[in-house]
């Protein structure tokens, strides 16, 4: 079973109801600070999401769709191309870790429970989070999303893949620690 790390942050201006180009219906209004982390929205709605909506729907079918997506994917940097394709192809039941940027070192863990979705009704520019997956988040005894500490999962929070938008976790020390923590 694969394990992934995902950051779900975005700019507050991306959802300003006073600026029609960046407003997304049914999403929260502007947030209290720049670079607000959308983790709370993702937890409440059982999703993970990443940006680059201008690439378009990665599930668009047929030859025309494949060519359009290929052109769009070639327009982004190679590492972003990899993020998007890995996110799209992430198998069901994959384990995902999402950091809480308001409390460094806190993480939420969940299991991918739904296929890739692209939200066509979100503005493409400048909104960043059109690519989404459903997630069943681990819950504590009160039914709230369970908080894990990075240190307990053998994860260092400085540098490396912690700074990336999306990354597969291949280190068996980390994946074993995640499995042990989830059993408790």
Language-model features: locations:
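Contiguous surface segments at macromolecular interaction interfaces
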Residues: 1-47, 126-184
């Amino acid at each position: 079973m694969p394990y992934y790390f995902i950051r779900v942050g975005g700019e507050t201006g991306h959802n300003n109801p006073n600026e029609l180009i960046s407003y997304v219906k049914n999403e929260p209004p502007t947030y209290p600070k720049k670079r607000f982390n959308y983790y709370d929205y993702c937890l409440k709605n059982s999703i993970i999401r990443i940006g680059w909506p201008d690439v378009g729907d990665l599930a668009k079918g047929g030859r025309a769709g494949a060519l359009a997506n290929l052109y769009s994917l070639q327009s982004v940097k190679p590492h972003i191309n990899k993020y998007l394709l890995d996110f799209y192809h992430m198998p069901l039941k994959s384990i995902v870790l999402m950091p809480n940027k308001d409390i460094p070192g806190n993480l939420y863990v969940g299991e991918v429970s739904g296929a890739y979705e692209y939200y066509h009704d979100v503005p493409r520019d400048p909104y960043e989070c059109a690519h989404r997956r459903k997630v069943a988040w681990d819950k504590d005894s009160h039914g709230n999303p369970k908080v894990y500490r990075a240190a307990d999962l053998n994860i260092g929070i400085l540098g490396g893949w912690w700074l990336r938008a999306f990354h597969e976790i291949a280190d068996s020390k980390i994946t074993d620690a995640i499995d042990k923590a989830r059993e408790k």
